[in-house]
């Protein structure tokens, strides 16, 4: 439902928006290094990168959109923050409480040019909410758009990057989700930019302007590029932000979750410290996902090192769902301080069939070697040879179930496990 609402608003408003942010006047910050080989706006676009005081590890938190859409207010935001504490989510590492679209009034302040928080929704203002979130030891996120309006029609930040970044910093904002709706036609791109240089495309420059504006405030802000996988963002995203959306919105269905895993699996070389492919907000607690599909949803986001932003009314999570999203071993892999790279697909055996998404993944952490197995079909026994796991070789190995912490035994040369329909096995492996 979220994708249809966002895109519907975007398309309707996009048809009405005139090119209010012309190329000659849109940049609100100056370049730190112009290139003589570039022309037009690219020649003067800012090149400064994102702060490395934040964003080293993929974000853990919550976002309001999937739970409440536009029906938000400070009571709901602060309720989520307090539930981080009472449900043990903060202890598990979750820290960002993020406000999505629909938080401001529909027009900017006439004298300051600033976006104005809707006083009927946020009577304490964003700064007042930030103070209360910070008092809990958590961080606050806000939402804007690299277009003239947000997806729901509220003021966007294109052409107003400096004034908006200054406001966000003054309010104590720690995280910015920056969407991609209502882009004027003169800020769009041809099918392929000159020299296939997507970093200097109009799309990238819209985001680079906000990077520079955030940097100028002096306050480190985790910058999330909600660019829907456009403009080959995985090629340049780490030069502009800390994470970047790889697709349109995920929905609470197996087909949506599996398709996003498949799409992301093609671009895992871009994932490392300060550099994360964002597979979108979580749907655990929403829709009709089976228990096994919710486990896979969480596990895949964890082992592929996507940001994990919960997207439901936290009051409604049951104990089983809480156990999934607080699983200590999967979160430890996701947040590993030594190894920044994700698990990647490998061929389990010489005769293993090809699937979409891939079923077998292997990765390293500071605790050892891990294998993750997604069953894309009905319940079946899955087998892999230790010698096919990168870095293992053949021999005898101890295998531990990461979901339960249970030791499964010692095995020679290969390992087999029964995996339920659409479930994921998560294994930690050490040489015996």
Regions found by a protein language model. Give the residues of each.
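Fungal secretory targeting signals
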Residues: 1-25
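Carbohydrate-binding surface patches
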Residues: 301-304, 309-311, 352-392
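Aromatic-lined carbohydrate-recognition surfaces of secreted/lumenal glycan-active proteins
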Residues: 138-156, 211-232
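C-terminal beta-strand-rich structural cap/linker in extracellular carbohydrate-active enzymes
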Residues: 409-432
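Aromatic-lined carbohydrate-binding/catalytic grooves of carbohydrate-active enzymes
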Residues: 80-195
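N-terminal module-boundary/linker segments of secreted carbohydrate-active enzymes
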Residues: 21-78, 83, 221
């Amino acid at each position: 439902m979220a994708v249809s609402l966002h895109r519907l608003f975007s398309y309707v408003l996009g048809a009405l928006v005139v090119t209010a942010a012309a190329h000659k006047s849109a940049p609100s910050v100056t370049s730190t290094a112009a290139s003589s080989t570039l022309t037009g706006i690219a020649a003067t676009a800012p090149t400064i990168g994102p702060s490395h005081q934040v964003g080293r590890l993929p974000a853990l938190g919550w976002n309001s959109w999937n739970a409440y859409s536009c029906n938000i207010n400070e009571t709901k935001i602060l309720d989520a923050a307090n539930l981080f504490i009472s449900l043990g989510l903060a202890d598990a590492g979750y820290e960002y409480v993020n406000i999505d679209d629909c938080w401001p009034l529909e027009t900017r302040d006439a004298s300051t040019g600033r976006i104005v928080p809707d006083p009927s929704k946020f009577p304490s203002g964003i700064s007042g909410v930030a103070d209360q979130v910070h008092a809990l030891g958590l961080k606050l996120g806000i939402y804007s758009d690299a277009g003239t309006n947000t997806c729901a029609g509220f003021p966007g930040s294109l052409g107003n990057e400096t004034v908006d970044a200054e406001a966000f910093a003054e309010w104590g904002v720690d995280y910015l989700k920056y969407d991609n709706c209502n882009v004027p036609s003169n800020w769009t791109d041809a099918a392929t930019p000159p020299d296939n240089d997507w970093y200097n495309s109009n799309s990238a420059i819209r985001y680079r302007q906000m990077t520079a504006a955030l940097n100028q405030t002096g306050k480190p802000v985790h910058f999330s590029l909600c660019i829907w996988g456009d403009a080959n963002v995985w090629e340049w995203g780490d030069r502009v932000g800390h994470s970047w959306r790889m697709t349109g919105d995920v929905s609470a269905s197996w087909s949506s979750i599996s398709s996003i895993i498949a799409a992301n699996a093609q671009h895992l070389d871009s994932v490392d410290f300060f550099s994360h492919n964002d597979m979108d907000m979580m749907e655990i607690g929403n829709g009709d996902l089976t228990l096994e599909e919710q486990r896979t949803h969480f596990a895949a986001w964890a082992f592929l090192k996507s940001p994990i932003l919960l997207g439901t009314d936290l009051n409604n999570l049951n104990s089983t769902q809480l156990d999934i999203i607080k699983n200590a071993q999967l979160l430890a892999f996701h947040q590993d301080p030594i190894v920044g790279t994700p698990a990647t697909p490998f061929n389990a055996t010489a005769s293993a069939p090809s699937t979409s998404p891939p079923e077998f993944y292997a990765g390293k952490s500071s605790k050892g070697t891990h294998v993750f197995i997604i069953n894309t079909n009905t319940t079946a026994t899955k087998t892999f040879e230790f010698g096919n796991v990168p870095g293992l070789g053949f021999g005898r190995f101890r295998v531990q179930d990461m979901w339960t912490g249970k030791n499964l035994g010692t095995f020679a040369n290969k390992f087999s496990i029964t995996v339920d329909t659409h479930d994921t096995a998560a294994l930690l492996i050490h040489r015996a």
